[in-house]
Amino acid sequence: MSNRTYSEEELLSILAAFGITDVVKVARYGSGHINDTFKVDDVRGVSYILQRINTDIFPDADGMMENISRVTSHIRSKGGKSLEVLGYKNPWRLYAFITNARTIDLIENADQAFLAANAFAQFQNTLADLPEPRLNEILPKFHNTVNRLKLLDEAASADVKGRLKLVQREMDFINARREEAGRIVNAMASGEIPERITHNDTKINNVMLDPVTQQGVAVIDLDTVMPGSALYDFGDMVRTSTAAAAEDEKDLDKVFSRKEYFEALVKGYLKDAKFLNAAELDALAFSGRLITLTIGIRFLTDYLAGDTYFRTAYEDHNLVRCRTQLKMVQSMEDQRDEYERIVRDTAKSM
């Protein structure tokens, strides 16, 4: 994550390159980990989102913007609405700001879980017939848990900060679950689970909500749209939307997966995810555990590597995040039978 600061003169110069000159305010915006994001207001009362693409994370900025352009054009061609990509100048881009909508970082009720899951299901469903060619794979092996384990092993072996001795409990927890890490990857390789176009960052704050009706207005943050498994998207919804506490909650007694939110996600998602095959449905509950484990692995890897990827606020921030994810995995495992029953019963009723 970039921690650099920008002078007002720099930002105004960048905005001028997009033809935006009558600016009254530019301020940092949002809570994202990766890109530098600013909200821009002009004298007419029109607002924009100005964003610097972090090319350390997204080296193929051209390929990413090509994906976004193709996806948004396809959505519009089917009568949907999308963010308009106004342009970008290496590596900056400018979007129209969606008014009369809001995002939330922590889900507030089960109804929001239903609406968010339904919004992502509609997003996937709309893109199911996107014409060839295949979208660019912006972040290869992004949700590949087997590969994430390999990177963890490399970070543990290097132990550049001498932190390995502090995380033996976390390593033991992860190692005990290695056998199931390849379930989705292997099923995709065999063709049992199909490749689909997926969002790959399905947090609640990537669905904009109408502040009055609470209905989903738009799916945003399309940087990671690329080929993948629908299970990755659903699994990340389970990870983020069923969590009773923040991603970096230190008190693990507050961290657990909420069954009523899981049930709302399943009902909202399956309402429009008619494209899922039997193998995908069978792995739907499992996907939440797997993606949560995968993110925990990523946080631990970054901690061992010296905190080079995720922005941190204090020395052990990534370790705290890892522990939160692993506690969520344990909570989902404790409720495994009930979660799988919810999926079966909901699928039968649809």
Walk through the language-model features, giving the residues of each.
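Active-site activation/catalytic loop segments of kinase-like enzymes and analogous catalytic loops
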Residues: 231-274, 290-309
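ATP-binding glycine-rich phosphate-binding loop
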Residues: 21-41
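ATP-dependent phospho-/nucleotidyl transfer catalytic cores
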Residues: 2-3, 27-31, 51-52, 59-62, ...
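ATP-binding pocket architecture of kinase catalytic cores
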Residues: 43-134
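Catalytic activation segment of kinase domains across protein kinase-like and atypical kinase folds
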Residues: 191, 205-246
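Juxta-kinase regulatory segment immediately upstream of eukaryotic protein kinase catalytic domains
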Residues: 1-27
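Short secondary-structure junctions
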Residues: 16-23, 77-81, 273-274
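Protein kinase-like catalytic core scaffold
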Residues: 48, 81, 93, 196, ...
